[in-house]
Amino acid sequence: MSSKQQAQGRNVVVIGTQWGDEGKGKVVDWLTDHAQAVVRFQGGHNAGHTLIIGDKKTILRLIPSGIMHKDVICYIGNGVVLSPEALFKEIGELEAAGLDVQSRLKISEATTLILPYHVAIDHAREKKRGEAKIGTTGRGIGPAYEDKVARRALRVQDLFYPEKFAEQLRENLEYHNFMLTNYYGAEPVNYEKTLAEAMSYAERLKPMVVDVSSALYAAEQAGQNLLFEGAQGTLLDIDHGTYPYVTSSNCVAGNAAAGSGVGPDSLQYILGITKAYCTRVGAGPFPSELYDHDNPARQDPIGVRLAEVGKEFGSVTGRPRRTGWLDAAALKRSIQINGLSGLCITKLDVLDGLETIRLCVGYNLDGKKLDVLPRGAESVARCEPIYEDFPGWKGTTFGIREWEKLPVEAQNFLRRIEEVAGKPIAMVSTGPERDETILLQHPFQD
C-alpha cells in the first residue's frame, strides 16, 4: 500500500530553524509526494519558496508548494495575511505554466486581507526610520497583522458583505490616512479606488473560500496525510526571534495549529530545516556572521564564497543575504521552542572544498559561557561565538543520495551537529533537485 493510501494519516510540520531561507520549499516539495494536502498557516507573500523541478525554476510566495503536485489540495489558513493582488498574480503565473490552481486552492474565510494602505504604511514607516529601519519587504505584512490584533482588519469573508466592507474600509482609511499624512508625511490612499479594487476580487475569490478548519478535520478523519508548510524561520518569530528584528507572525511549529484551525495533537512530526551554514537578510544580530554585502567590516572571503556558491540572494526581494558559519547554539534554541522531531540539513554541498569548517557551539556573553542563544537582540548582539573546527572534504557531496557515499569528513560534521543539537538528522539535501536527497528517517512513517 502506498503512503497515499494509508488507512490512518500522519501529519508533518516543516519549520525553518534559522532566519528563513533554509530551503524549506525543496523539502516540502519532496514530502508532498507523501501527502494529500499542504497547508500555509502564517506569513504572507513576503517570503519566497524556490522549487527546481527538472530545468524549471518556480518561486512561490503565497500559494503552498504542494500546488506543483496535481493531486494535492492546498490550503491557506486563517493565520496568513493575504494580498488578493499578489494571489491572483501568482495564480496567473502558475496557470500560464499549465497548472490547475483554482480548483485545488482553498482559502480560509477568516484570512486577513492585505490592502493598499498596508503597503503604503509599510513603505512610509521604513522611510521614516532611516538607518534604524527593520528591513521589511515593504509588502504590507506587518501593518496587516497590526490591524488584525487591533480588531480592525478586513478579512476574506467580509468581501461578501459589500456594505459592511465599505463602511469598515472607510473607517480604516480615516485612521491610516491620518497617520500617512500627519505623521509620515506621505500621500493618502484613495478610498474609492481601494474599494473598487477589493470588490473586483470578491467573485474571483468566492469559489476558493472554505472553512479550512473543518476541511482539515474531515481530511484527518478520512486518513489523509497533511503537510504544514512554515514560512520565514524560528529566529524571525515575533515572540521568540531576535526582537525587534523579526517578522510580524509566529513562525514556530505551535502556530501550525492556531494558524490553520487544527488541534495540537494533529502535529505529529516536526521537521526543522537548517542550512549547513547560516544566512540572514536585512538588519539584526548574527553571532557567527562572516559576510555582509553592505558592511565593509564583514567581508571575510569564506563568507563571500558561501554567498556566491550558495547563490544567497532573496528569492522575493533579490537582496544579498548575510552569511556565516552554522550556529548550533541558535539551533538548540529553535529545538526548544518547536519541539522538533528531527532535522533536515540543506545546502551541504556549498561547503565542498573548504579546508576547515567551523561550527558555533556556544557563546561568551559578558564573561559567561552560554550553550544556547539568549533572548533579545541586545544580548544576541554581544555574543562572541565559540567554535569547534572540523577538517573539510575534497570530494563533492553534490547530488549524493546515500549516507555511506558522503565523504567521511562530511559524515563526522553532520554527526557532531546531531550531538550538539540533541536531535537526529532525518534528511540531508545535497542539491536543488527533488531527488538530490539523503533520507535517514521518513517524517511520514513511524
Curated annotation (Swiss-Prot):
Keyword check for Membrane: no
Keyword set includes S-adenosyl-L-methionine: no
GO terms under cellular component: cytoplasm
Enzyme Commission number: 6.3.4.4
Superkingdom of this protein's organism: Bacteria
Binding, Mg(2+): 21, 48
Active site per UniProt: 21 (proton acceptor), 49 (proton donor)
Compartments where found: Cytoplasm
GO MF term (any one): GTP binding
UniProt-listed NCBIfam families: PRK01117.1, purA
Function: Plays an important role in the de novo pathway of purine nucleotide biosynthesis. Catalyzes the first committed step in the biosynthesis of AMP from IMP.
Membership in a protein family: Belongs to the adenylosuccinate synthetase family.
Protein name as catalogued: Adenylosuccinate synthetase
Origin organism lineage: Bacteria, Pseudomonadati, Pseudomonadota, Betaproteobacteria, Burkholderiales
